Amino acid sequence: MEADGQSWSGESVSGPGPGGGGMIRELCRGFGRYRRYLGRLRQNLRETQKFFRDIKCSHSHSCPSSPAGGGAAELGPAGDVAAAPLPAGQLSCISFPPMEEKYLQQIVDHLPCILILGQDCNAKCQLLNLLLAVRVLPTLKLDSDESCKLRRLRFTYGTRTQVSLALPGQYELVHTLASHQDNWETIPEEDLEVQEDSEDTARVLADLEVTMHHALLQEVDIVVAPCHSHRPAVDVLSDLANDFLPVITYALHKDELSERDEQELQEIRKYFSFPVFFFKVPTLEIIRSSSGRADSERSPLSGQLMDLGYLSSSHRNCMASDQDCRAQSMLVEQSEKLRQLSTFSHQLLQTRLVDAAKALNAVHSHCLDIFINQAFDMQRDLQITPKRLEYTRKKENELYESLMNIANRKQEEMKDMIVETLNTMKEELLDDAANMEFKDVIVPENGETVGTREIKSCIRQIQELIISRLNQAVANKLISSVDYLRESFVGTLERCLQSLEKSQDVSVHITSNYLKQILNAAYHVEVTFHSGSSVTRMLWEQIKQIIQRITWVNPPTITLEWKRKVAQEAIDSLSASKLAKSICSQFRTRLNSSHEAFAASLRQLEAGHSGRLEKTEDLWLKVRKDHAPRLARLSLESRSLQDVLLHRKPKLGQELGRGQYGVVYLCDNWGGHFPCALKSVVPPDEKHWNDLALEFHYMRSLPKHERLVDLHGSVIDYNYGGGSSVAVLLIMERLHRDLYTGLKAGLSLETRLQIALDVVEGIRFLHSQGLVHRDIKLKNVLLDKQNRAKITDLGFCKPEAMMSGSIVGTPIHMAPELFTGKYDNSVDVYAFGILFWYICSGSIKLPEAFERCASKDHLWNNVRRGTRPERLPVFDEECWQLMEACWDGDPSKRPLLGIVQPILRSIMDRLCKCDSERPSRGLDDST
């Protein structure tokens, strides 16, 4: 061994050559930058995986545990929890997609490694020496490719220079090498070669591992591929790609590729998509020559590589001019341009990081959108379910009372209906009775008499025939009395019940069954002869009389005439009034029974929903307070990583202003946008971090709109203020001034009314996206050079379903209900009303009622009591009425912005037209 602890990065290759400290420093910076950002990506991925594990654990029936029963969850192959799937419910779709997780895990696990391939081993060794700026490998003897037996070489960082043989990924071999025997500057050739006649298979397969105290090796390992005869390049690359991100270099020393070279490159391109850095190593003649090939000339090598698909006609321009373009293969034939390897590696590594950051942010954004949508669904469920239950109870009562009224008032009608039915059906009933075939009674064909028991059975069967036919006829006519109920409100009631029962056990829809029983009571009237009914007593008296007559006279012969006579006597003995009374009584009994059962079932359903809603509210709170903010912060970090990789950290210009939570700076150019405004925010605690992250997500999720300030991107500065804090830099569209400054300078009436229209349009757009701004005020309305307005600062902007009821905003623009914690998007209408007061006044002076308040608390108390800005003499009547409507204390009475907008247009048309024709009687021009 030689030079223990000595740094090699300061030495140079003896003789002239392209290698040197400048190139090494650039490569070190590039690979060091990659490792730094890869560490942030790895940390974000780790926290994302933990987030999804926590979601599964908190919303599964049982949490997964380690086999030993410890606290750590058991991880699957991609870092996911090997747990049971989430139960069906609101958050069951929240999970890390397996393919994305596997891809990202591979990205963060595979560190970069420079792989040196080449036309022959001499060229590969020469390129390695140039990269390290040290002649560590011999290059003069390895000139015969046929006799070359170079084994795979691996150069890594170490505090001491060491050379050893090791099986890849296994163990080091204890062998004495030539480099161990004496001091050396160049590794002895016999250590580099494979001794094929050796009986030790491990020694034949082993790599030569070299550790060196070198700046470049501290950032990236270097692997030199073995000679072609020992192992094909595609196999070497395949092994390396399993554990590393290969930065492939290909050393050339001839003016053209051989047939074997082309075949090798075709195989690499067939199986891998990595770009390749082709470099022509300098020969002695090239080094001595002061002239080289001009860049514009196309060399034979360039033509061959273009034919193979490695190069395109624009590859040089892309590499030279656009640092953000995707990595492409590159050919460098001028030895002094080896430092372009740093550009090539930068683009390769950056492409890798940007793709990973995009994939991770896509997962974050998708799941965050699901959270927000689920929050809306849960909020709606919490609001609508109690109303549905109350509606169901009310409508069922109406249905019950309507049917009961029918039963009470229809008795006389039913009596007439029964008489009419009997008269209509009499002949038909008599014929049916005469032709009736008795069951279980043998009637002699020769006219012989039968016994008393058979007579009783025949009479009973005739009676049942008459009653069943009558029952069917009466029921059919009674149906028409309740059909209108189905059309009026039963359909709505049934749909309401179905929606309530969806979340309950689908096998027990007893509430709907009882509702059907209530409605169908009329369909199932039974004119039967059960014991205890007046109809039963009446008909049994008639039967007794017949039986008594049969007892004292000769038993009758069962003939057609006898059957008609029995049927006639049964019909004549029926009392229509008693039947009607019996039917109505039966109807009421069934109705009462079903009504009571329905009420009991509804109470049971309500109790079930009460427990479910309690769990839903807990979950809704968890989504708003924990899950969504936590995921939003991860999303902010992944998106900021993507932005800083693509566009670098922005440069702060002069300070433009300060707000409650940050400072706004001028930023001349960033990401192709100029000029920009940069808002630096230093969140003081976790809550502000979460709020900022959610704000960023809402802003980035919004489609571009001409009435909203564009957000170009974000960067997290981990060294803000000299490293004392972490700041989020939000890069936005820069406008001319804010409305406060504009009113102070003076704006014409037409301009001010146009600004009001622009603000309404912007707020309407936010509301259409489900967002509430909550802080509409003069300083949050920015003006461009044409004095068109755009809304900015969505710091308090949230979807209604994500609002926790916190008191936010600027005191004089805050609606009274904000202090109760229960509010909706009408708070923006209130704030616009106050803003419109300033717009109509044409000045920035506070309303007198607010100016007299000594403190915020005093102001808030006055607003709660109904204090509003005063009417100024310059106000137009219609403008004043619009202001008053907007700041009404009752949120439900405030106009919708869709109504405000046309009113503003008509005001503008009227006042500005009047102003152009004659002096205005209302609003004065403040310019």
From Swiss-Prot:
UniProt-annotated location(s): Cytoplasm; Cell membrane; Apical cell membrane; Basolateral cell membrane
Keyword line: ATP-binding, Cell junction, Cell membrane, Coiled coil, Cytoplasm, Kinase, Membrane, Nucleotide-binding, Serine/threonine-protein kinase, Transferase, Tyrosine-protein kinase
EC number: 2.7.12.1
Gene Ontology terms: biological process: cellular response to fibroblast growth factor stimulus; negative regulation of apoptotic process; positive regulation of ERK1 and ERK2 cascade; positive regulation of fibroblast growth factor receptor signaling pathway; positive regulation of kinase activity
Family affiliation: Belongs to the protein kinase superfamily. Ser/Thr protein kinase family.
Domain of life where this protein originates: Eukaryota
Active site: D775 (proton acceptor)
GO CC aspect terms: anchoring junction; apical plasma membrane; basolateral plasma membrane; cytoplasm
Record-linked Gene3D superfamilies: Transferase(Phosphotransferase) domain 1
Binding residue positions for ATP: L656, G657, R658, G659, Q660, Y661, G662, V663, V664, K679
Catalytic activity: L-seryl-[protein] + ATP = O-phospho-L-seryl-[protein] + ADP + H(+); L-threonyl-[protein] + ATP = O-phospho-L-threonyl-[protein] + ADP + H(+); L-tyrosyl-[protein] + ATP = O-phospho-L-tyrosyl-[protein] + ADP + H(+)
PANTHER family with a match to the protein in the record: DUAL SERINE/THREONINE AND TYROSINE PROTEIN KINASE, DUAL SERINE_THREONINE AND TYROSINE PROTEIN KINASE
Disordered: region residues: 1-21
Polar residues bias locations: 1-12
Protein name: Dual serine/threonine and tyrosine protein kinase
Expressed in which tissues: Expressed in many regions of the adult brain.
Function of the protein: Acts as a positive regulator of ERK phosphorylation downstream of fibroblast growth factor-receptor activation. Involved in the regulation of both caspase-dependent apoptosis and caspase-independent cell death. In the skin, it plays a predominant role in suppressing caspase-dependent apoptosis in response to UV stress in a range of dermal cell types.
SUPFAM superfamilies referenced in this protein's UniProt entry, alphabetically: Protein kinase-like (PK-like) (SSF56112)
Major place of residence: cytoplasm
Molecular function terms from GO: ATP binding; protein serine kinase activity; protein serine/threonine kinase activity; protein serine/threonine/tyrosine kinase activity; protein tyrosine kinase activity
Stretches assigned to coiled coil: 393-429
Organism from which the protein derives: Rattus norvegicus
